[in-house]
Amino acid sequence: MQFIDEVKIHVQSGHGGAGCVSFRREKFIPFGGPDGGDGGKGGDVIFTVDPNLSTLMDLRYRPHLKAGRGKNGMGKDRHGANGDDLTIPVPPGTIVKDAETGEILADLTEPGQTVVLLKGGRGGQGNARFTTSTNRAPKFAQPGEDEEERWLRLELKLMADVGLLGFPNVGKSSFITKVSAARPKIADYPFTTIKPNLGVVSYKNYRSFVVADIPGIIEGASEGAGLGHRFLKHVERTNILLHLIDLSWIPDRDPIREYETLNRELALFSPELAGKEQIAVINKIDLPVVRENLPSVIDWFKERGIAVFPISAATGEGIPTLLDEIARHLWGQAEEEW
């Protein structure tokens, strides 16, 4: 399924139904009183969170959405039917903004959460409601209220506990495959991952957490380079960031410089992002070239007070210890300490 995380749509609530002008016409009562019923209420525009959705793709191809119009009132005091509500399902993490002003109208994060964004117009009153002591046969009724309409911009920011960062081809997809049931595309070239992947990690004693594999970020990402800042927003809701580092490219690539570059891009995009807690994860320690350079790189991180964990996504070495550390950050302690 195509991953779409931004759409612009036009939504419109339902117009209220008109009140009815009607008079009783029954046998032996040729001049009965007014019996015009009220019009029905127009449908509302409602957003609801569907946990089974992970993209805004369906809305991309339906840019104009409209709730049902209320039916007009009828004679014999019959009320017009209310218009059908327009219910729009969205994935968890969807932000609804006014497309013109950028105002945030709703932040939808919890499964089942609903918000009424536009109210349908009220139905007009029928002439039966306007009878007075001086006007026993009113020949007028109210029209229904107008509908509301608005252009909206929807943005999806994935809901994950852990954000997985790193330059292209450092092994993020291999890592998420190893620790979860997610199966992202994996190959030995940059930008294999062109959409965020979510993996649920089943931890000890039936606890679990969600990891988001964010597509490779390069220098200039905050300004749109590479896959750009489009995906940086997906780490904003995470509690902790794992920064994967690959030493197998030495000397062609400098892993320390890449680490500093990525953090600079985070800071340029959002100072709050740069301030999130990070764990440095050195991947591919099953390779001789990585083990050779491992001590000096570990020392570099430790000198700066940065937690660092060597692992192999290929063999699984070091991963249980890393998961324990993640658990401490998320829940305050590792499972065996409970």
UniProtKB/Swiss-Prot annotation:
UniProt: GTP binding residues: 166-173, 191-195, 213-216, 283-286, 312-314
PROSITE patterns named among the record's database cross-references: G_OBG, GTP1_OBG, OBG
**Which residue intervals make up region (Disordered)?**
66-91
Task: List, alphabetically, the InterPro entries matched.
Answer: G_OBG (IPR031167), GTP-bd (IPR006073), GTP-bd_Obg/CgtA (IPR014100), GTP1-OBG_CS (IPR006074), GTP1_OBG_dom (IPR006169), GTP1_OBG_dom_sf (IPR036726), OBG_GTPase (IPR045086), P-loop_NTPase (IPR027417)
Provide an example Pfam family for this protein: GTP1_OBG
What are the UniProt keywords, alphabetically? Cytoplasm, GTP-binding, Hydrolase, Magnesium, Metal-binding, Nucleotide-binding
Where does the record place the Obg domain?
1-159
Binding residues for Mg(2+), per the UniProt record? Answer: S173, T193
Q: Please describe the quaternary structure of this protein.
A: Monomer.
Its family remark reads: Belongs to the TRAFAC class OBG-HflX-like GTPase superfamily. OBG GTPase family.
- What is the official name of this protein in its record? GTPase Obg
Protein's organism: Geobacter metallireducens (strain ATCC 53774 / DSM 7210 / GS-15)
The major lineage groups are: Bacteria, Pseudomonadati, Thermodesulfobacteriota, Desulfuromonadia, Geobacterales
